[in-house]
């Protein structure tokens, strides 16, 4: 068993693909993400969390307007069941009425079936919201199939896409925010990363690892 102690509150069991994270308190972003993930876990839906929230989850000091979830495609009735369960837990559907079966089905046909993302809000909050989409590309399926399990405070379970893919993908857009996220994750998990895997994704996405050092020197 290979376990890396990343920091005082993070341990990474590489062999099991599991990260143990202890947080003194959960942020609003955390609570919303955990509740949404709990619903997916309960229904057995395969998913991963991608993009900015992953860095925030591990302590990057910034806020995000959205939390990105990507799942295996859902059948229409599965999506209906999912939405009704989310409704009971306080979520709202931006593109439709989460309390109406016909509205949920219209959103499914008009958005998810056509490859568009949809958004959910929680309670009276506008931000952060959940951006929800279903996998379409091999890269998206890879992120789900090889997701890591993060166990937060020994009670919450959330799946994230592989760190190597997250870092490479964050370098691809080249925005300051994305570069900052990539530097944060790379610096934090450097000892535990599969560097061969990281270089594979850097090559696939045609980005240079030196961008991490350049971006890091700015911060």
Where are these regions (language model features)?
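Compositionally biased terminal segments of proteins
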Residues: 2-219
């Amino acid at each position: 068993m290979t376990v890396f102690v990343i920091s005082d509150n993070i341990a990474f069991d590489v062999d099991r693909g599991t990260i143990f994270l202890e947080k003194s308190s959960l942020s609003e972003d955390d609570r919303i993400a955990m509740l949404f993930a709990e619903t997916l876990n309960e229904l057995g839906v395969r998913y991963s969390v991608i993009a900015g929230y992953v860095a925030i989850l591990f302590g990057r000091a910034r806020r995000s307007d959205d939390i990105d979830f990507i799942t295996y495609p859902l059948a229409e009735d599965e999506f209906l069941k999912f939405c009704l369960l989310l409704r009971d837990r306080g979520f709202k559907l931006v593109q439709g009425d989460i309390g109406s079966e016909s509205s949920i089905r219209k959103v499914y046909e008009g958005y998810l079936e056509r490859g568009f993302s949809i958004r959910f809000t929680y309670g009276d909050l506008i931000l952060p919201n959940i951006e929800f989409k279903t996998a379409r590309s091999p890269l998206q399926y890879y992120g789900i199939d090889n997701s890591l399990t993060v166990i937060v405070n020994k009670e919450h379970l959330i799946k994230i896409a592989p760190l190597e893919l997250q870092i490479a993908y964050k370098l691809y857009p080249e925005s300051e925010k994305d570069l900052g996220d990539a530097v944060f994750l790379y610096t934090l998990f450097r000892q535990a990363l599969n560097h061969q895997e990281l270089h594979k994704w850097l090559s696939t996405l045609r980005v240079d690892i030196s961008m991490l050092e350049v971006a890091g020197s700015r911060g």
